[in-house]
Design a protein with these regions (language model features):
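A short, conserved structural fragment
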Residues: 98-108
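Short acidic, hydrophobic short linear motifs in intrinsically disordered regions
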Residues: 71-82
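Short, amphipathic alpha-helical interaction segments positioned at domain boundaries
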Residues: 115, 120-149
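Long, low-complexity, charged/polar intrinsically disordered regions in eukaryotic proteins
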Residues: 2-46
């Protein structure tokens, strides 16, 4: 890595701009950095939570997101009620927020109504922003934002994480045949559980990790497209919000053990 990358690229790329209070508030609400959550440290414009959101979020978007709460799904009528905004205008704003990666959406409720969710940074908005070529080209700092938010929340805490991760970070689902003979493997740890649950709705999407690293010269020779598989409502999300997703079909290549191939 070049010296200027080490010293400059993980800082606010636009220090000359005035500090935006709604973005600071939103960054503080979404972050999972313990020191900031506990009030031991103050979030500033030099922190990635601020400059990452500032790149993809207007003040108006931030005000709406602040009313959503983190990982608290809300339908459009519910958001109209708590924001007082016109329904059509609000829906257009939410669509823009989803396009930028600030929020996601799904239909996982008894009435199967579309609901909007303000996610964490990782996994969440920092990844989504890196999946969209248009966003990443306009705001290459999003690559560094993803790296920072996948690393700094756990600094000083990783030694306390027990084997298995305790639900922290991302969970790897191994190849099915590697766990079929394991008596301790529960259904959630088998890829067949997830593929059967969301049968018929899959999408291939780019690897946000690979795409983000290329923005600060740590990329590899891999083509980042098509590495990740989104299932269920997330498949619709990565396609509809132009996260370079495309619907695919998954075929059983053998009846037992179950191996899967994407096409």
């Amino acid at each position: 890595m070049a010296e200027n990358t080490k010293n400059v690229e993980f800082k606010n790329p636009h220090p000359e701009l005035p500090v935006r209070e709604p973005i600071l508030k939103l960054g503080k609400m979404v972050t999972d950095r313990a020191a900031i959550k506990l009030g031991l440290e103050k979030l500033t414009a030099d922190d990635p939570e601020y400059w990452g959101l500032a790149a993809i979020c207007t003040d108006e978007m931030a005000e709406v997101a602040l009313k959503m709460g983190v990982r608290k799904p809300k339908t459009l009528p519910e958001l109209v009620k708590i924001t007082g905004m016109d329904e059509k205008y609000l829906e257009e704003l939410l669509n823009k927020m989803a396009f930028n990666g600030v929020i996601e959406y799904n239909w996982e409720n008894p009435k199967h109504e579309k609901q909007y969710v303000l996610p964490m940074f990782v996994p969440g908005s920092a990844e989504f922003a890196n999946m969209n070529d248009a966003v990443l080209e306009e705001h290459p700092e999003m690559g560094r934002f993803f790296e920072r938010m996948s690393r700094i929340p756990l600094e000083g805490l990783t030694h306390m994480v027990p084997p298995g991760g305790a639900g922290i970070g991302m969970h790897v689902i191994p190849v099915q045949k590697e766990v079929d003979m394991c008596n301790e493997a529960i259904s959630l740890e088998k890829i067949s559980y997830w593929l059967d649950k969301y049968e018929g709705k899959y999408a291939a999407s780019p690897c946000s990790c690979r795409k983000s690293r290329k923005t600060y010269d740590e990329g590899c020779a891999d083509d980042p497209e098509g590495w990740c598989i989104a299932i269920g409502d997330m498949a619709d999300y990565v396609v509809e919000t132009q996260k370079d997703g495309r619907y695919i079909c998954l075929l059983y290549t053998s009846p037992s053990p179950r191996d899967y191939a994407a096409s």
